[in-house]
């Protein structure tokens, strides 16, 4: 059996040079995300969300980005979940995208706010029926006796609302408003490229970090 400490990889897929990087992090992110989508990478929209509890204990989970623009990065979830509870007490979070094939990582930090009810309603209504029922069926992050509990909850919701279940009041969107972005491109000899964008007095400042 190969020892995990002996696993090696040479990073040679690309480079990240200031001369060709975008002036704003949102444009740089859009460029990389569109390239990941065009390359057919598996779930290029998957991102890790890191939150911290009131007593300083961090936790992470993978969710799917559902929108991004000049206001921030959007995803949807159960507000009563662990991440929801932690964001209620500490509204700062970090996101990470890892596109393995392209040897790229994007890290984003900032303050998190809820999306408007109108935004949450619009996205919820666009989801498949099973997903809308699932938002009612799952008491996310809470212990349950068995999977049968979820199935029964979904069936009960379907019987009550039919084809048009409303959005649960405990389910909706979050938007991370970035104040820091970092773009990492793997390079040969572990001399990786790292560019960071920091928001200072309303202006994005870009600088290179040592790998």
Curated annotation (Swiss-Prot):
Binding site residues for substrate: 8-11, 66, 123, 127, 131, 190-192
Cofactor(s) the protein needs: FMN
Cofactor note: Binds 1 FMN per subunit.
UniProt GO BP: pyridoxine biosynthetic process
SUPFAM superfamilies: FMN-binding split barrel
Top-tier EC class: oxidoreductase
GO molecular function, one term: FMN binding
Keyword Flavoprotein: yes
Pfam families tied to this protein: PNP_phzG_C, PNPOx_N
Catalytic activity: pyridoxamine 5'-phosphate + O2 + H2O = pyridoxal 5'-phosphate + H2O2 + NH4(+); pyridoxine 5'-phosphate + O2 = pyridoxal 5'-phosphate + H2O2
Subunit: Homodimer.
NCBIfam families to which the protein is assigned, alphabetical: pdxH, PRK05679.1
Family recorded in the similarity comment: Belongs to the pyridoxamine 5'-phosphate oxidase family.
Entry protein name: Pyridoxine/pyridoxamine 5'-phosphate oxidase
Organism: Leptothrix cholodnii (strain ATCC 51168 / LMG 8142 / SP-6) (Leptothrix discophora (strain SP-6))
Gene: pdxH
């Amino acid at each position: 059996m190969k020892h995990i400490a002996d696993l090696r990889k040479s990073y040679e897929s690309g480079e990240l040079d200031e001369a060709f990087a975008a002036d704003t992090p949102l444009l740089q992110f859009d460029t990389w995300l569109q390239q990941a989508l065009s390359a057919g990478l598996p779930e290029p929209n998957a991102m890790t969300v890191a939150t911290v509890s009131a007593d300083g204990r961090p936790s992470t989970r993978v969710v799917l980005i559902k929108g991004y623009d000049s206001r921030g990065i959007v995803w949807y979830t159960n507000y009563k979940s662990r991440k929801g509870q932690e964001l209620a007490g500490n509204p700062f979070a970090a996101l990470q995208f890892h596109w393995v094939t392209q040897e790229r990582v994007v890290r984003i930090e900032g303050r998190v706010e809820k999306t408007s009810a109108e935004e949450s309603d619009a996205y919820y209504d666009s989801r498949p029926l099973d997903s809308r029922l699932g938002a009612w069926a799952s008491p996310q992050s809470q212990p349950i006796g068995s999977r049968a509990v979820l199935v029964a909850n979904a069936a009960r919701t379907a019987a009550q609302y039919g084809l048009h279940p409303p959005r649960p009041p405990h389910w909706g969107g979050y938007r991370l408003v970035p104040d820091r972005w970092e773009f990492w491109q793997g390079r040969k000899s572990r001399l990786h490229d790292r560019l960071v964008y920091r928001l200072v007095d309303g202006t994005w400042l870009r600088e290179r970090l040592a790998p």
